[in-house]
Amino acid sequence: MGSAARNLCIKGAREHNLKNIDVMLPRDALVVISGLSGSGKSSLAFDTIFAEGQRRYVESLSAYARQFLGRLDKPDVDSIEGLSPAIAIEQKTTQRNPRSTVGTVTEIYDYYRLLFARIGRAHCPHCAREIKEQTVDQIVDTLMTVPSGSRIQLLAPVVRGKKGTHHKVLEAARKDGFVRARIDGALLHLHERISLDKQKKHSIDIVVDRIQLSDTVRKRLTESVETTLGYADGLLTVLVQGENSGTVSGKIETSALLPSELFFSQKNACAHCNVSVPELQPRLFSFNAPFGACPSCAGLGIMQTFDLDRIVPDQNRSFNEGAFLPFKPEHEWNRVRFAALAEKYHFSLDDPVRNLSKHALDIILHGSGSEALEFSHERKDGSRTARYIKPWPGIFSELHRRYAESCTHSQREVYERYLSVRTCEACRGMRLKPESLAVTIEKKNIHALSALSVDDSCEFFKTLHLTEVEATIAQQILKEITDRLEFLQNVGLGYLTLERAAATLSGGEAQRIRLATQIGSRLTGVLYILDEPSIGLHQRDNERLIQTLLHLRDLGNTVLVVEHDEQTLRVADYIVDLGPGAGVHGGYVVAAGSPPEVMQVQASLTGQYLAGAITLPIPAVRRTGNGNVLTVHDVHEHNLQHISVRIRLGTFTCITGVSGSGKSTLLIDVLYPALYNRVMNGRLPEGKFSSIEGTEHLDKVIYVDQSPIGRTPRSNPATYVGVFTDIRMLFSQVPEAKMRGYKPGRFSFNVPGGRCEHCKGDGVITIEMNFLPDVYITCDVCHGTRFNRETLAVFYKGKNISHVLDMTIEEARSFFSAVPPIVRKLEALCSVGLGYVRLGQSALTLSGGEAQRVKLALELSKRATGKTLYIFDEPTTGLHFADIIQLMEVVQRLVDQGNTVVMIEHNMDVIVQADCVIDLGPEGGMHGGTIVAQGSPEAVSQITESRTGWYIKEVLCKKT
């Protein structure tokens, strides 16, 4: 057997910064590619191996199919042998569709729909009575179980809650030979004159038969049931009385006992409310199909409405002061109409909105109804004055009209700033029609079941009680559901609910969901390529993830993982360590082999870290702060259980806890907006808490997250940190530029003048693909340089502006060493480990971790105040241990300057660096949200209830 059959052989890989490397990877093994950020890991795994696998797959398709997929370029590699079908599971949150949920992405919701369609119990959406579709034999069998000797009356419900005299209905029943009817609860003889108020709603049941039950009446009962069902269009009501029946007195029969009432239907209808329920089909439970979706919100569960707080952000202002943002007072059309409103409804245009009467504000917002306003409006050209007499539509109605009539994206954007998302009032956010939500399994409808966490859902199905028939029907469906739920648990996502919108998932969560889906497919002989699946996972959950990866391998697959996590590296069958540096200094294979073999290689930073030769030292002294404390009281947003949190200012604090325990809710949803609004005079929506103290000790709050630094090809690190402004100014001072009269704007790709007008300075042409992602191709005029020939003719130290943008940040720092303002900003980028990134690299190509560090560099390049609070959300994402050392030096320097750093983090090497740890838990979802432990890492390690404490203890013992 050749090596290609046992191994994946890559020869001459040169993609991006790879240095013509040869790599041999074992198949059917867990292989980890490690190395510094920017060393070429993704270039090897995704841009070379996966890209070639994808290209070969497309090449195998017919010419007809290939025309829809386009041509895929061959990666810059000599050859790849032994390549299996490849599946890439990346960090990207691809589902931006608001209809996509965790349940739909994992297909669990599809099985839920099938389960409810097959064994769900339908109820009337109005009265909640159970509705069963039954045959005549089933109805008779049910009635024969009533104790012998009981008297029953078979009633045909012919009118349900309808106005009218219903004379024709009663007359028809009399002609058909029926003697009695129950009208509005009273039993009446039909031969008497019955007069009903036509303005009131009535319910009429025709008495078809009265039977005393015994073993000998089955035949008569069957005939009467058939007659009743035929007369009432498949509906039947049965009054059951004990042996002590009432007597007939005059026209009304009364019962000595309170009769019980039974309802039957042949057609999934409620006999009591005369409401039909559709046949139970899977589509009835789909919020993506009109058959099941709530008609008000079309199955989204939310609606966009114009928000008064956005239209009038400052209610202390008047109309004349511009209180109503979409209605500027300087526009005469607005002014004359508001003046007419003020005159008619007795308020002044100088009155602050807060002081307007409720009636006046209601008219302004919702319109004057049928009451007309009279006002005059002079035409712009002054030709004549038009006189209007018509009702005022109201601000909300007019904005809806303008928004609906907007023809361009920019016009719609103007009005979208005044919209806010509200829960749909019709379905209360449950997305489905009332008929769909009235179907239950063990008293839970499909939305209530989807609202459970994965962990709670597993428990629900373990304790589900079914009849023998139901169990037989649902057996295979339940197996598919429980298998998929367990896969989600195994990748650390037990805290997620199936109703969670896919667009709100982090990149790591989205990746692990796709991983769980792949495990469910049980494919073999596949090459799986994953990008840091441990991102966002607590150490406890990470152990289960590793077991999942090993299970995927044991199925007969090759699992190739780009990873920095120590646990994953130690269990790998094979490690390929790239380096030795990043960017131009990387791209070589520094070490390859089993973990013990890699540890023997002195040049491998990864190997030395695993061997314990390189460590992040534990601080000798923990800071106690500057004496001031920030306290947030009674936090109860999402799953947080009315906790109060104290953060000592002037310290480095880590927020820890298992996945879903409430870390992001506390820091991002509550603390950051609360501080930003009070310290920075912002207007961010705040999470729920009662009060906050200590904000007066801060003068700035900075949140450094992982969102992109820009969403177009023009956005790049140089523009984001502002260094490109200094570079453009420098180029404008070059003698050639002065001679040509070029200003700094000439060297900008955002404005006309010096940029290539064919691509508008993007360097690429964007091709919109409608329902597919946009495609970018290199501009064939400027060939990606972004500028026209005249601009590129200006040189500084032998380089033009395009050459500079193509430099790595490290190269640029050396190139501009004589220009302090430029060096200071580039130094900040280098200090956070981004020296390998190119100055002009498109923001679209930066990972979340890289984008976060660019933002951090921007803040580092500013003058420190010593009273700033920095908030970080897992800043070690995508970082090698050596990069983490560099990052922690920056963080500790910020705190040494008197600032406060609060960070969500799972990396134990970072957590033990903190002055204080706040550990949330004990579990995720509704089982979390409390403070399990708080104090120094040493103190937290002694608390047995703290999951994080267990792992802190391990790290502290290992390093001491």
Curated annotation (Swiss-Prot):
One of its GO terms (molecular function) is ATP hydrolysis activity. SUPFAM superfamilies: P-loop containing nucleoside triphosphate hydrolases (SSF52540). Keywords: ATP-binding, Cytoplasm, DNA damage, DNA excision, DNA repair, DNA-binding, Excision nuclease, Metal-binding, Nucleotide-binding, Repeat, SOS response, Zinc, Zinc-finger. GO terms for cellular component: cytoplasm; excinuclease repair complex. Its main location: cytoplasm. GO terms for biological process: nucleotide-excision repair; SOS response. ATP binds at residues 35-42, 657-664. Transmembrane segments: none annotated. A zinc finger (C4-type) spans 270-297, 756-782. Residues 327-605, 625-953 form the ABC transporter domain. InterPro entries: ABC_transporter-like_ATP-bd, ABC_transporter-like_CS, ATP_grasp_subdomain_1, P-loop_NTPase, UvrA, UvrA_DNA-bd, UvrA_inter. It comes from the Bacteria. Belongs to the ABC transporter superfamily. UvrA family. Forms a heterotetramer with UvrB during the search for lesions. This is UvrABC system protein A. It comes from Treponema pallidum (strain Nichols).
